[in-house]
Structures are given as structure tokens and as C-alpha cells.
Amino acid sequence: MRDLLSKKSHRQLELLELLFEHKRWFHRSELAELLNCTERAVKDDLSHVKSAFPDLIFHSSTNGIRIINTDDSDIEMVYHHFFKHSTHFSILEFIFFNEGCQAESICKEFYISSSSLYRIISQINKVIKRQFQFEVSLTPVQIIGNERDIRYFFAQYFSEKYYFLEWPFENFSSEPLSQLLELVYKETSFPMNLSTHRMLKLLLVTNLYRIKFGHFMEVDKDSFNDQSLDFLMQAEGIEGVAQSFESEYNISLDEEVVCQLFVSYFQKMFFIDESLFMKCVKKDSYVEKSYHLLSDFIDQISVKYQIEMENKDNLIWHLHNTAHLYRQELFTEFILFDQKGNTIRNFQNIFPKFVSDIKKELSHYLETLEVCSSSMMVNHLSYTFITHTKHLVINLLQNQPKLKVLVMSNFDQYHAKFVAETLSYYCSNNFELEVWTELELSKESLEDSPYDIIISNFIIPPIENKRLIYSNNINTVSLIYLLNAMMFIRLDE
């Protein structure tokens, strides 16, 4: 979807991503090679992004350029900026909110000619069709195609473009939706939390706009759970919620509307409760197959990485649901900001073999069930496994062999012991810290020693397979940071 940005904006976004991700010096020539453009273009882009993002501090020197005050929150601001300043995305959003308007009104809104509008819509459709099954029509002005894809695309778009606390939907206030969701939480065992609540509100309000313009999803009766719909329609308090919908939205909360709002969660392959899922494992051959595939996969991972799976059935339930909500919950696929993919990559940087095995087996699971097994879906399912497995990170870290650390000082033995004790307290328990006790010291003796890391306040020549930390005054704060960082570099090598 990044091709909906102009070439210049696309390049500037990639430029900022490079500077954010690597947090190091880049020469313009290197950036030009990475971005496949001229050094002049890089120079112009740097000038533009410095002006567009005054809160970011760019540091230039003979070493090149870098951003020196970045943190993980700043990058989100970058994506919001490119969404906001993209004509293509802005026109898409305008049409979503104003279906049925005249094409001339779009031209007036964006100060473009009729021919320019048709050219832009043609470009939008060309890019969208590479990934989604829908298109924009100007005769009349509407968005048509696969309704599931349309609803997912725009819900994901709103989640990426707007900040977490923003609510950009003028036609639908959030209160009646919150009332409806709270009723669902009360009447079912659906897990309620802040992020899930916001995700559902975004999905439901997107569905409401589509319903308002007369677009409904086709419901396969064979895969639809009528009992869930009937249960909700008979829930205590539904009348009050229906009145709020009628008065604030001018929409009747009848069975058809409720079905359209929750169609993803009323499908038979989605289980709102773990106990219902476990009962169905014994009755439905497809669910049984899904369960046993995941069970075998989890057992293999548990044995290979010596992880005790405390919540195996609960984890299988979550994985099964996730696999059957393709393009029906946020972050399955991204528009510009691959936030979930970045999360997986960060975890993979620490545990590369583990994540590689997870992805391989989950891809096999999806393919066997003949559901979507795209790389983004595999990432999405891998995220569910990693975050929903109890104490996963703790278990993986505890199973790592401890790093042996030698501390030496040219002051005296007491100084070395003081540093070792301090580091032992502040660093993780994945280190064994010792001081040098022999009377003599040589490079050869250090080469033959069992230590992985050597800390000293005097210079030691480079030693193969040893990580050396030289600190003239042994700055404890810096050492704590360096030592913990080295632990993560070592993991799963």
C-alpha cells in the first residue's frame, strides 16, 4: 500500500525508517545506494524531513548524519504525517465518509481537475487490487467489491492514521458502541481489555458506515452461528442500547444490523469461550484437526526449547481463533506502519532460531487447514503464540547458558570485587561474574580462560571469541547497559 504515497514521500518514509531503525551514522552516498536514488535527492529529502519534523534532532558531521533523540514513540508520528499529507489516502478517506457524493465535490475539496481525479482513482485502484479485492468507482462515487476486504482496509487505515485517543468519526459517537460492547462483555466470556475494546470500536464503526451506505456482507448460513446472534438479541439491556442507536445514529439495532456488526464473531469457527471450543473439539472433525495440529506443534516446541506450556489449551484456543479471523481483526495486514511485524522482528533479533521454528510450523498449520498462509498472516499468528504463551520470555532466558564475565582492575582486587558485586546486583541473573585471582596475566591465559566477556580498566589486545569492555574509570551505569546488551547479542547464536 506504500505505493499510494508519491515516490518522494515513499522515499522519505524509507529514509526515516533507516535512521530510526539503525540509530547510527549514515553517509549520503550510502543512503543513496540503499534508497536507489541520487545523493542530491537524499540531500533534498533530508532538508524536507528536517523541516517537516522539527521535534526530531538531526546530527550532521564528517561521519554522516543520524537522528540522535529517537525513541520508539517518535516513529508513529512519522506515519501519521505521511498519511495526513497523502492526496491518495485523503481522497480514499473522503470517499469512504461521503459515498454517493458528486465527483465534482471531490475535485473542489482537493482543488484538482476532473481529469486529475480520474487519474488518481485509476492509480488507487491499481495499487489496491494488488492486495485487496475492491475498487473505487466514480459513477456513482462508491467503494465496491469484497466487503470483508473493504471493512478491514479502512478499519486498519483508521488505526494507523489516527492516534490511539483520537475518534475521527463525526457521524457516530463512541458511547453507543461502548454500551453495546460492554453488554457483549457482560453476557459472554469475551476477554475485555483496553486494546481489544478500541479495536472492536474501530471495526464496528467502520461496519456502521458501510451499513449506512447500504453495503452488507454476504453471510454463509452454513458457517454462521445463529445461537450467538439469538443470545445477544435476548440479552438484558439490549433495548436500552437499541434506543441509543436509534436516537444517536438513526439506525435500528435489529437482527440484521447486529449480524452485520458482529459477523466475524458469529462464524462457527470462532469461539468466544474456551470451554465451547474444547467441547467442539470432540464434535467437529475440522476443529479436532485444528486442535491436534496445534497441539503437536506446541509439544514439539516445548521439547525442543525445554519450555513448560502452562496454558496449552488456552493457547490453542487463541491460535485457532486468530487463524480464522483473517482480515477480520486489526493488524492482520498493515497499510504503512508494520507495527506487529516490527514487534516480531525485534523478538526474532533476540531469539532468531526460536522464531524461525515458530513461523515454519505455523505456516504448515495454516497450509494444512487451507486458510490464508501469507507472510503477514504467519507473522500475525506468530505474534499470538509469542504473546499468549505464559512466561515464554522468562523460560527462554532461563534456558540460556549463563555468560561468564571476568572483571579486572589495575587498582586492586577490592575494586574489581566491588565492580563485580555491583554488576551482579543490577544485571540479569544470566551472568556469572568473577575476578582474576592469579598472580600473572597474559593474553594467552585470557585466550584459554572460560570467560565470554572481559571487563577491565586497562587496555587488552583483541582476543578471538572474547568480548572486551574497556572502561578507564569503570562507569557502572554504562557497564550495566553494555553487559545487558551483550546478553541479547549472544542469545540463540
Swiss-Prot record:
It comes from the Bacteria. Keywords: Transcription, Transcription regulation. The keyword Transcription regulation applies. Belongs to the AtxA/AcpA family. This is Putative trans-acting regulator SP_1800. It comes from Streptococcus pneumoniae serotype 4 (strain ATCC BAA-334 / TIGR4).
